[in-house]
């Protein structure tokens, strides 16, 4: 039987009066666009709920949901989130949802981070109850922000670690059961004296041995150092690879337009690094930057990615939340 409002909505008396006059018809389409979460709790057909961990990428469209991918990082809007949830549920992909969108939406005129604007973007989803989708396994986490430590992205003044924890607290005040993730390493998060009571997940992306968090490291040391630091902070850990700028030069193929002096990863690098990261027992997902059809359509790259997919699929699932209790809002 259709109903007018999701259980998370508390309509005001004026709205109730309007419904009494015109009935539910005008509201049904908005309500019915959201899929029903599985009625029996966690669904073991999702990677990480049963066997394996999610394997996926930034930049996938809903039309690309499905094998070989079992996870995706998706930038959504209030008008698109329902259709993304439907698509993910239909293809059994676990979704990390970027609710606020790109950084351009929450910066000051000088390019510095504006926490108030970020919160305003999050407020547009207050009528959406994500908790059933978290329980089912469809929604893996709320992606708070990309690369907070990259000063160039934030007008020369990166968001503070205290601001990141406040972002996580604000998310939890609306959706206590929704895990919070930030795409930066636990090592960066651990600098300073911020305590993370609401942030759940750190994110370590291999960008090669010449720059980024992997500078001077082997993939094995990168894995071990990030796992150790995440454990110290009691954070879950997502790993990823930078396919297009994370090579050591052995591919001979220049990186993206932003970094033509860097290198794409070779097939051998993808297979080796991906296997090292996907097999790490502490890692709860392998979600990489980014989907690029010309890169992935090369036979040797496709074969390398498929070998990593198999590793991610057969290992035991791992939770992304590492604390014993969910912090109070």
Regions found by a protein language model. Name each.
Residues 24-27:
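N-terminal Sec signal peptide cleavage junction
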Residues 5-7, 29, 36:
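Generic detector of N-terminal low-structure segments
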Residues 33-329:
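Glycan-processing catalytic domains of CAZymes
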Residues 1-14:
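Bacterial N-terminal signal peptides that target proteins for export
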């Amino acid at each position: 039987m259709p109903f007018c409002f999701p259980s998370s909505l508390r309509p005001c008396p004026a709205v109730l009066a309007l419904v009494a006059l015109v009935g539910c018809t005008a509201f049904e389409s908005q309500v019915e666009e959201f899929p029903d979460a599985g009625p029996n709790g966690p669904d073991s057909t999702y990677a990480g709920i049963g066997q394996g961990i999610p394997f996926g990428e930034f930049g996938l469209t809903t039309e690309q949901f499905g094998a070989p991918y079992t996870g995706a990082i998706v930038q959504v809007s209030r008008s698109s989130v329902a259709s993304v949830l439907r698509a993910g549920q239909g293809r059994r992909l676990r979704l990390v949802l970027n609710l606020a969108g790109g950084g351009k939406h929450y910066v000051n005129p000088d390019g510095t981070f504006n926490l108030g604007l970020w919160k305003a973007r999050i407020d547009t989803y207050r009528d959406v109850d994500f908790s059933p989708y978290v329980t089912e396994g469809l929604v893996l986490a709320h992606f708070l922000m990309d690369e907070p430590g990259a000063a160039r992205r934030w007008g020369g003044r990166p968001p503070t670690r205290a601001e990141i924890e406040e972002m996580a607290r604000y998310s939890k005040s609306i959706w206590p059961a929704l895990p919070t993730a930030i795409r930066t390493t636990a090592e960066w998060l651990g600098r300073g004296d911020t305590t993370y009571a609401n942030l759940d997940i750190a994110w370590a992306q291999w960008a090669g041995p010449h720059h980024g968090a992997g500078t001077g490291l082997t993939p094995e040391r990168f894995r071990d150092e990030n796992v150790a630091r995440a454990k110290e902070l009691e954070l879950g850990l997502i790993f990823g690879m930078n396919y297009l700028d994370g090579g050591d030069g052995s591919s001979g193929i220049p990186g993206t337009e932003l970094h033509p002096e860097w290198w794409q990863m070779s097939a051998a690098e993808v297979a080796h690094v991906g296997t090292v990261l996907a097999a790490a027992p502490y890692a709860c997902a392998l979600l990489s930057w980014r989907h690029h059809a010309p890169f992935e359509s090369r036979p040797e790259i496709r074969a390398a990615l498929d070998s990593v997919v198999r590793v991610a699929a057969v290992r035991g699932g791992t939770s992304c939340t590492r604390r014993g209790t969910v912090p109070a809002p």
